[in-house]
Amino acid sequence: MNKPTKWKTQKEAFVESLSYLEGRKKGKITSIKTPWQSFNNATTDGIEWHSTTVIGARPATGKTLIKDLLVNGAFKLNPLMNFRVLEFQFEMLGKNSAIREYSGHLQKSYKYLCSADGQLTDEDFEKCRVYAKDKLKYPIDVVEEPCNMIEFREIVQEYMNLHSSVNEEGKRLYKNTIITLDHSLLLKRSPGEKDKFDMLYTLGETLTALKRKYPIAFIVLSQLNRSIDAPERNEDGKYGNFILESDIMGADALLQHADTLIGLNRPGKQKIKYYGVERYIVDGDPTILAMHFIKCR
């Protein structure tokens, strides 16, 4: 038997591409629909498998909420898809993350739900219980313990192998899996990584290696650089109002590995009335969320 080579022929690549196009044409291969039509239109009708989506925003802008809406929407809007979700949540405990989900769903404050701002009513507690019961129907697992990139790769590989099967021909079949990473900078540095930028470069390379091998859709949340808060960036009607590629923390490390790069902004929190050179009317409303599609592969 000939030893496998590290390359494939051009014919193999074209055959694979035609098979993929035929699968999409017949509806056998579909993207993960999101709750926003503008998101679906900007991408390939949603999030594709074997891809990485990076979402960057200031703290308290709502990137975790958007991630939760993407995950919940994936189950509700794609009922015929068979997939799992693995969430890496290092910022807070799972119970605290769940309470934040209740907060977003009920439009009630975290303090109120914890009876620290008036006692939680029986009615609202019941709404939380119903939400939790509905969410528990979905196959979602959570990693709370911070890890470095070596451990991250091992966890993902173990998870994908655990939820795989072998067909009659002896080929291993992996289950489609959405993997979220809440706050990429909370990963620990591995030996040999000098700083957070080294870690982000390793993260990008690891995500690419994993998404090539497994049917994974990564959703990675990232912070922004402090330059976004420069006073001139928050003057009305300026191009700098928008989230730019260079604003993403570790953009050089993550951009080349991301299939989709999104910047979230709440211009009203910076007291902006007219957003960007198009002068979109925001009028200082902090509830308006702008979603910038910086890169769509």
What function would you assign to each model-found segment?
Residues 113-118, 141-144, 189-199, 232-244:
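Flexible beta-alpha connector loops of hexameric P-loop NTPases
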